Structure formats: structure tokens, C-alpha cells
Amino acid sequence: MDQARNFYNTILKSSHPLLLSFHLAGKAVPIVFYIIGSMFLNFTPQFITVVLLLSFDFYLTKNITGRKLVQLRWWYDSTDVNKDSNFTFESYKQYAPGPPINAIDSKLFWWSMYVTPVIWGVFAVLCLLRLKIFYLILVIVAMCLTAWNTYGFRCCDRWEPNSGQSDGQDTNNWFALPSVPGFENLSRLANIQSFFQRQ
């Protein structure tokens, strides 16, 4: 009971306690529904509900909570084939100094962003061990959505607007494989943006 009260008091110290609560709930609700949903629903409605919850969390994090809690926003434009990177970023770094980012907001935002894909990864391993292929598909969708959002925010956080590089130009180094002679196609496969573009 004391831990719940301490966590509640921590949330109250946030700059945006209601928004931080929605952010954390957006991460937790799909996981909880994935765990207990099979007790009262068949697979199909559970699958649809979890994917809708994940989509809502993706939208909420990408467009609202990321912007308010850590002052970061990103989007991916796959239509512009002339750019080195299709990421576009908005960051507190490119504007005049404003109110500082609350340490509690930042810490809980980043912890939730990094822990959520790991939890879905554990579920993927469990699905493989128990040979639950259909649930594995659901977990892979969840891993992709949460990891892609985390990757976008990580690149946005690392982006330096005054470095002379275009938006997101140097962000793909984090995901690139090491250069191994004879395996150029493998490293191109790891570069996510080139996967969706015509050569």
C-alpha cells in the first residue's frame, strides 16, 4: 500500500500529472488486457482489442505525451525519396529556452518507452516456447509498434538541430549493423527506411 501511495505522490510531482497517468496507462492497459483478456474473450476479439489499444497508445505517445512530457515529436515521411533520412523531428533544442523538462516526466516517459518493448519481447519468447503462433503474431505487432515509437523518440532526442545535418540524417547509425565485407545486403536490410523505398 505504501508503494502505491509513493507512486501516486510521484505522479503528483509531475508537471502534467493527468497526461503522465494517461501515458503510463496507455502502456499498461494493452499488456494487462493481453494477459487477462483470454479469460473472458475469444482470440479474435482479444486480438482486435489489443491492436486498437496499442494503436491508441502509439498515437497518444507520438503526438501528445511525447510533445508535452519531454518536448519531442517525430514523424516519418516515406514520400520524399531525395532525403538521406525520412525522419522529421521537432525538439525543444531548436527553440528559445522555455520551461525546463520535469525530471519525473522525463524519467517515467523514457522508462516506460524502453521497458514496454522488452515486456512484449518476453511475451514473444513465451509464445515461441508454448507454440502459440497466433498469439505470437499479436505480440510481434505489439513489439513493432512500441519499438518503432521508441526508436523514433530516441532518434529525436539524439538529434542536434544546429549540427548542420538535415532532420534525422545521422540517426540511422544507432540501428546500423557493423560493416562486414560481403554482407552489404544484410546492413541495407537493417536500414529500415531503405526497405520501403524503390532502388
Curated annotation (Swiss-Prot):
Keywords: Glycoprotein, Golgi apparatus, Membrane, Transmembrane, Transmembrane helix
Pfam families, per the entry: DUF846
Topology versus the membrane: Multi-pass membrane protein
Compartment list: Golgi apparatus membrane
Quaternary context: Interacts with YIP4 and YIP5.
Extra remark: Present with 1040 molecules/cell in log phase SD medium.
Cited function: Golgi membrane protein involved in vesicular trafficking.
Protein name listed in UniProt: Golgi apparatus membrane protein TVP23
Organism for this UniProt entry: Saccharomyces cerevisiae (strain ATCC 204508 / S288c) (Baker's yeast)
Gene expressing this chain: TVP23
